[in-house]
Amino acid sequence: MSKEKFERTKPHVNVGTIGHVDHGKTTLTAAITTVLAKHYGGAARAFDQIDNAPEEKARGITINTSHVEYDTPTRHYAHVDCPGHADYVKNMITGAAQMDGAILVVAATDGPMPQTREHILLGRQVGVPYIIVFLNKCDMVDDEELLELVEMEVRELLSQYDFPGDDTPIVRGSALQALNGVAEWEEKILELANHLDTYIPEPQRAIDQPFLLPIEDVFSISGRGTVVTGRVERGIIRTGEEVEIVGIKATTKTTVTGVEMFRKLLDEGRAGENVGALLRGTKREEIERGQVLAKPGSITPHTDFESEVYVLSKEEGGRHTPFFKGYRPQFYFRTTDVTGTIELPEGVEMVMPGDNIKMTVSLIHPIAMDQGLRFAIREGGRTVGAGVVAKIIK
């Protein structure tokens, strides 16, 4: 089959497999690529190609991740699979592989296990919006009642973490039998693909979201005023539009009187572009790196939040010793460091390098944030942890 060219016409959706070790996540990933390639075209990927995951670096953290892609008639999917449990934790917290939806793999022979629960909880904390369940190894369970029991347990577990357990699609299948080409089990993979197409809504592209530009630099240009530069994170900014300057100090409003890129004037700056924005009547000293320009009312500044954090191990260049409550590192948001103090969950005295932990953070300055914002934890300029805002407190 000749190599197909990448079609930009189909909506692009990011998904991934999650679930307990040895429940069949990688086998399922291989089965999806194989069955969909057979029915709809595209490349099949063998189990060992996926299992042998390359190392990647995200925010200074080493993660083993496999990326595969596949197509259904209506969509193009990018799918991420991780070999080890620690890789999942890091992946989800750093947002290295943002997921529009996840496929939770549960072996019907075991039912939900500790990591099943942990991955669902992590999914809730880091903002995975949709979960579809693949009940695997159903070819090894003859008892219909047992399957129903496992299904019920999974639904209860999802509901416990605020996912709609009763309405979640659950597919009963066998990844291994589908991979081996057994028709009745291949059907189950097509059923799963159909749920991906219908249950996970098309993600909103960055360009369609409200405008946000993290400020990297501020210049004063004589006779013209103040220019801030940075990469537009989302949305579009047009000359003449009103924006808010949010974070660190009290929020203020101003008007963008010009947008430029490589010293050329533009009508607008779009998500992904590095631009300079000329601001009306704003003094150089009123703005600093670490603030954001945003569509008015779209984002607010906060100091206190709950977060899910992964603490780098010594081997990853992290701390060599644990830390305790009252620890005061820097929290790096977008373009700047802000000092903050931490509170640990009840009953947790200390946090070891390599742990993942839920912690409450209180910053000394407010930062423009919403749920799902990623940050790094730093000490003297080196990264010692990565986290995500799970819930804003104030």
Curated annotation (Swiss-Prot):
User: Which top class of enzyme applies to this chain?
Assistant: hydrolase
Keyword check for GTP-binding, yes or no: yes
Annotated segments matching region G2: 60-64
List every stretch annotated G1. Answer: 19-26
Residue ranges, annotated region (G3): 81-84
* Keyword field contains Metal-binding: yes
Which HAMAP family does UniProt cross-reference here?
A: EF_Tu_B
Name-wise, this protein is Elongation factor Tu-A
Organism equals: Pasteurella multocida (strain Pm70)
Phylogenetic classification of the source organism: Bacteria, Pseudomonadati, Pseudomonadota, Gammaproteobacteria, Pasteurellales
Q: Which gene encodes it?
A: tufA
